[in-house]
């Protein structure tokens, strides 16, 4: 019984490094299971008095070892989740970076097109502008044939006023009106 207590104290004093090796946890769990099975199958008369107490200790040891293993798996799962989130974030950043690069290339391409169009159409525009201004100066004494013809706007309030006046309706009788 003293060796069991010493083993329990040693296992509690030497915490298992969960970061390094899960095999240690599996080995410890396996040893404790073997110890429990050996104890249960052993038929020693001297130990029959303490059977309940020893079984409780063995089961407690087994539960502690399984809890340590469970904690290890939980820590691994949280690490995996954190790594997964980092990878997803990196993928999203990469995707946005590619979109920006594509848009920058598109902007550069259209910027070059605008320059090309400007070099092509600017001389035409300047020559047409020069012709237009020289023609307008030559025709300053004559009525400008390029000026727009003035079209009077209808008097909108008087039209609305005429439409809103009451008029007799032949179908409704002499005194009726339609607005």
Swiss-Prot record:
* Superkingdom classification of source: Eukaryota
- Report keywords, A-Z: Activator, Coiled coil, Nucleus, Transcription, Transcription regulation
**Coiled coil regions in record:** 81-119
- Give the GO terms filed under biological process for this record: transcription by RNA polymerase II
Provide an example Pfam family for this protein: Med28
Which GO terms label this protein's molecular function in UniProt? transcription coregulator activity
- Main localisation: nucleus
Q: Where in the cell is it found?
A: Nucleus
Query: Could you tell me which InterPro entries the record lists for this protein?
Result: Mediator_Med28 (IPR021640)
Which is one Gene Ontology cellular component term of this protein?
mediator complex
Q: Does the keyword Transcription regulation apply?
A: yes
What's the stated role of this polypeptide? Answer: Component of the Mediator complex, a coactivator involved in the regulated transcription of nearly all RNA polymerase II-dependent genes. Mediator functions as a bridge to convey information from gene-specific regulatory proteins to the basal RNA polymerase II transcription machinery. Mediator is recruited to promoters by direct interactions with regulatory proteins and serves as a scaffold for the assembly of a functional preinitiation complex with RNA polymerase II and the general transcription factors.
**PANTHER family linked:** MEDIATOR COMPLEX SUBUNIT 28, MEDIATOR OF RNA POLYMERASE II TRANSCRIPTION SUBUNIT 28
The family classification in the record reads: Belongs to the Mediator complex subunit 28 family.
The subunit structure is: Component of the Mediator complex.
Q: What is this protein called?
A: Putative mediator of RNA polymerase II transcription subunit 28
Q: Give the species.
A: Dictyostelium discoideum
